[in-house]
């Protein structure tokens, strides 16, 4: 038989667990609502066009609709999670410094993507692949404390695809079937650069 001192503790534990479950359920519901509102503010028309074009070129390159959807969904989820962490002041000073470095690296990547398209005979797939992998490493460092192994896997899925030298060579082939996709991608990225969204 339980002593009187043990009974209230057991009851308090039951109450705590129930409240904890309720709070978790609320967070999950709120999280979905917040994610949707953040997604619409983060992904403007230009970003959406770039993502759509990335999807089309990925689908055509891989010949696999599900794989293309997975890569783009993982990209969107990663961007949204990063934005949620940043907007909720979850990063420490070191992570904020890494975030600034990451933003500069992404800007450099965007400028390089466009430059390689605009200036003939400058394309170097190894340069683009290296820049993409540098972005990947910075991103892993930034989210290390905050996100799960599954999220790190999503990051790898996105960067494994886009940093693949064969994919980049096919995308930038001046006589290849992806030339129209590259033009649309660069138009969108140029617009994002002009609007200082990247």
From Swiss-Prot:
Q: A GO term (biological process) for this protein?
A: positive regulation of apoptotic process
Where's it found, cell-wise? Cytoplasm
Q: Which UniProt keywords apply?
A: Apoptosis, Coiled coil, Cytoplasm
Select a single GO molecular function from the record's annotations and give it.
Answer: small molecule binding
* Sections of the chain in a coiled coil: 49-83
Q: Which Pfam families match?
A: DUF758
- Membrane found in the keyword field: no
Q: Does the UniProt entry include the keyword Lyase?
A: no
A GO cellular component annotation in the UniProt record: cytoplasm
Q: What does this protein do?
A: Acts as a negative mediator of apoptosis. Suppresses the TNF-mediated apoptosis by inhibiting caspase-8 activity but not the processing of procaspase-8, subsequently resulting in inhibition of BID cleavage and caspase-3 activation.
Family stated for the protein in its record = Belongs to the TNFAIP8 family.
Write down what this protein is called.
Answer: Tumor necrosis factor alpha-induced protein 8
